């Protein structure tokens, strides 16, 4: 009997293949999804809402060759083990595989095998317990993809009509954008308040430490209490007089307590991503890439962690016993009195997954240094430490708060804490809390009641002027936490949300902080006003709960799709009717400064809002914060950097992919490609030249006169012939056919190809086989 096992990734296939080759089981990989909705042919009918939500599929173009090879392998086998990932998406991929294979092999038997870790024991156990496909999970995944498709397909074109083309809306991305935009608006609306912090330095036993003002008369003083300058000056003067008169601090009260800090549960997807952001500074997608490699077993030996898309912190009984025994052996004083099992706080924790843990706790990070490298090692170390720490005792701190009287009118306070028992901190140091303030604990000497301490002068009384700060921008960790708290998204989608928003141009990420672009704010405002229910956090959370009910068989998938589709389609039709005949531009009250005849119009462009004169003869355009034709805005010039082409000053500008610098004489080009200014030079943000691909100058352009025609290697090492003027009118693809170059410049074709080939080979070691002939041909 011939048997085939299908997993998702080649590396996993290689690893599992080593376990099963003696059994005659061939293992191959689907390389992810094998089919997708046929949007090109069926458009909005790819999921036909008027015909029972019938879906029309096509082989995924990027995976077509591999899928056809896989189908040929399955043509004559007796049994196929569907061993894709143990979640809804994996179940759906298995169903698509089964549907395709059945067309080629009607007598084939299909068995579903699931496993949470990749090692021989787990794989053989999964085969022994093979089941049928879970169609409830398949339907739940179809509902998710169906709603995502319908929402995106019908809502996105409305954005095109209302704002500009190329924008998109999404069932999950739009509520996430709302979260970020609301924070952005909080920051913009924030008005800082000035306050003063008053402290003094004192000492005992040669240990100096600061104490903070905590009482004036009978009034308590908090960190931000003193906001009146006259009040501050009055009491600052009195305090300085007391210091000058040798007034001493008298210990009034010493409060001590034991504070314990418990270990956190083993990782789930969201907490792993949060810690990776805090501790390693990684993006969510980088974290998931490293986790995928650890799960599959990059060395080809076995997987190193359990499945990494989970919202359950549960340890299997076998793993719980193993981790606890390891801790008892290696950390006998720090291990808990008994094994600790954790449970999910979420009622919607998906499927029967475990937490993210090492497949074998005895494989310490140190022992795997030669096997795991770079990101994989760092993430494995974090997972290993967190898993072991979850079975250890709490850390114990002695916390001390000392109150000092400074005359009868003032009190000061000092806080300190000392770690007296490490507990789980033996193996795991927690990352900084999200956007948390730093602890103000200080090292304190041994102090007793009624002790008298003198101020250290200088500095004496220290008064610091400070300002309240706006709410911090989200990073990927804090965004994931908020989405999880709201019940938006699932473990499989957390990493993709920031990436999707960034790719759409709705957000930028700088130093791990997320800023919403003007475009993102505009899109959010439109969706929030026209689709309020669909970006409502509770609605999105309820939708996730319903999908969980479909997955568990408690709700019919068609019923759920109908519940979504009816009201949504009605709203879409209403909005389209409202927008009919409306312009994307809005008239402002600002008169055109160039012609003085018309009010400027405002609309959204690729880089955000811009204003323009409606008179086509005027051609006035204004991009806020940039140089524009007709007037000047405030611009930032680079110091000591001049344009190497014309000697002009270099201006820092904002582009779609970040900041860059440009010559002040570079005004861009008109639609016909003609220059608006006298220069075309652009560079990096610091003024250094861009890393341009190697290019071979062929000759002067016959259309532009002042530009060169050149060959450059960009795509698969195939040279492309272009004009320096990107808007070259001779070819709409911006690429110029070889024949046209030969005819226009009167040069030999064979000689041209030979010279270009030798140039790239000799100068850059690029082996080029042929020139890109023009827009109708495709490079090999």
Give names to the regions the model predicted.
Residues 295-307, 504-513:
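A short, conserved structural fragment
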Residues 118-200, 257:
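C-terminal or mid-to-C-terminal helical accessory/interaction module adjacent to the motor/catalytic core
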Residues 1-2, 85-87, 164-168, 256-265, ...:
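Conserved short loop/turn motifs at secondary-structure junctions
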Residues 220-265:
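Metal- or metallocofactor-binding catalytic centers and their adjacent structured scaffolds
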Residues 1-145, 151, 159, 224-230, ...:
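Intrinsically disordered, low-complexity regulatory segments
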Residues 2-4, 156, 311-780:
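Basic, low-complexity terminal or inter-domain segments flanking catalytic cores
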Residues 14-41, 174-221, 323, 328, ...:
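Structured, non-catalytic alpha/beta "coupling" segments that mediate domain-domain communication
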Residues 254, 262-276, 301-308, 470-482, ...:
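Short acidic, hydrophobic short linear motifs in intrinsically disordered regions
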């Amino acid at each position: 009997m011939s048997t085939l096992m299908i997993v998702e990734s080649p590396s996993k296939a290689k690893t599992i293949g080593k376990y099963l080759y003696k059994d005659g089981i061939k293992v191959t990989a689907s390389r992810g999804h094998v089919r997708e909705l046929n949007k090109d042919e069926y458009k909005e009918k790819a999921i036909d809402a008027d015909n029972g939500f019938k879906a029309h599929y096509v082989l995924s173009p990027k995976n077509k060759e591999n899928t056809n090879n896989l189908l040929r392998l399955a043509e004559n086998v007796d049994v196929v083990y569907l061993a894709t990932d143990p979640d809804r998406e994996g179940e759906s991929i298995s169903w698509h595989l089964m549907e395709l294979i059945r067309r080629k092999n009607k007598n084939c038997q299909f068995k579903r095998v699931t496993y949470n870790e990749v090692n021989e024991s787990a794989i053989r156990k999964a085969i022994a317990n093979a089941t049928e496909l879970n169609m409830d999970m398949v339907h739940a995944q179809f509902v998710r993809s169906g709603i995502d498709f319908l929402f995106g397909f019908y809502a996105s074109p409305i954005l095109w009509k209302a704002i500009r083309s190329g924008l998109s809306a999404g069932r999950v991305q739009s509520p996430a954008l709302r979260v970020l935009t609301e924070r952005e608006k909080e920051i913009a609306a924030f008005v800082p308040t000035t306050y003063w912090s008053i402290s003094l330095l004192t000492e005992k036993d040669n240990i100096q430490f600061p104490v903070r003002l905590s009482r004036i008369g009978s009034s308590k003083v908090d960190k931000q209490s003193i906001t009146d300058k006259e009040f501050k000056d009055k009491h600052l003067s009195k305090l300085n007089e007391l210091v000058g008169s040798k007034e001493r601090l008298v210990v009034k009260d010493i409060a001590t307590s034991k504070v314990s800090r418990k270990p956190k549960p083993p990782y789930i997807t969201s907490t792993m991503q949060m810690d990776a952001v805090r501790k390693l500074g990684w993006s969510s997608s980088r974290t998931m890439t490293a986790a995928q490699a650890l799960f599959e077993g990059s060395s080809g030996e076995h997987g190193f962690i359990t499945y990494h898309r989970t919202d359950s912190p549960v340890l299997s009984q076998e793993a719980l016993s193993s981790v606890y025994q390891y801790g008892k052996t290696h950390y006998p004083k720090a291990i808990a009195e008994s094994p600790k099992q954790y449970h999910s706080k979420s009622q919607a924790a998906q499927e029967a997954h475990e937490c993210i843990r090492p497949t074998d706790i005895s494989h310490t990070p140190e022992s795997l240094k030669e096997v795991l490298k770079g990101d994989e090692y760092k993430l494995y170390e974090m997972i290993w430490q967190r898993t072991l720490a979850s079975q250890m005792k709490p850390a114990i701190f002695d916390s001390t708060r000392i109150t000092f009287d400074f005359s009868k009118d003032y009190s000061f306070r000092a806080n300190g804490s000392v770690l007296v028992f490490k507990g789980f901190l033996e193996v795991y140091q927690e990352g900084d809390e999200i956007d948390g303030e730093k602890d103000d604990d200080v090292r304190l000497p041994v102090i007793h009641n009624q002790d008298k301490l003198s101020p250290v002068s200088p500095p004496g009384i220290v008064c610091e002027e400070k300002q309240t700060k706006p709410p911090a921008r989200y990073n990927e960790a804090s965004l994931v936490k908020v989405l999880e708290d709201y019940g938006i998204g699932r473990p499989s989608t957390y990493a993709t949300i920031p990436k999707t928003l960034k790719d759409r141009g709705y957000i930028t990420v700088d130093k791990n902080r997320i800023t919403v672009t003007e475009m993102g704010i505009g899109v959010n405002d439109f969706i929030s006003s026209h689709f309020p229910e669909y970006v409502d956090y509770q609605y999105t959370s309820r939708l996730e709960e319903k999908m969980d009910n479909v997955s568990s068989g408690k709700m019919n998938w068609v019923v759920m799709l109908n519940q979504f589709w009816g009201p949504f389609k009605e709203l879409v039709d209403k909005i389209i009717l409202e927008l009919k005949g409306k312009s994307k531009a809005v008239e402002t009250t600002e008169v055109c400064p160039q012609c003085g005849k018309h009010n400027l119009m405002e609309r959204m462009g690729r880089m955000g809002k811009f204003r323009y004169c409606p008179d086509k003869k005027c051609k006035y355009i204004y991009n806020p914060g940039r140089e524009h034709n007709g007037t000047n805005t405030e611009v930032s010039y680079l110091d000591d950097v001049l344009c190497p082409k014309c000697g002009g000053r270099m201006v820092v500008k904002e582009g779609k992919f970040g900041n860059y610098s440009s010559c002040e004489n570079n005004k861009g080009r008109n639609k016909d490609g003609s220059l608006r200014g006298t220069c075309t030079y652009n560079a990096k943000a610091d003024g250094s030249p861009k890393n341009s691909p190697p290019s071979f100058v062929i000759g002067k352009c016959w259309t532009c006169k002042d530009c060169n025609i050149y060959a450059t290697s960009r795509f698969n090492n195939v040279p492309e012939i272009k004009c320096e003027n990107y808007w070259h009118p001779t070819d709409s693809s911006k690429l110029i056919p070889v024949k046209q170059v030969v005819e226009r410049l009167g040069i030999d074709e064979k000689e041209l190809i030979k010279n270009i080939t030798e140039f790239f080979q000799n100068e850059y070691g690029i082996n080029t086989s042929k020139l890109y002939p023009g827009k109708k041909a495709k490079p090999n």
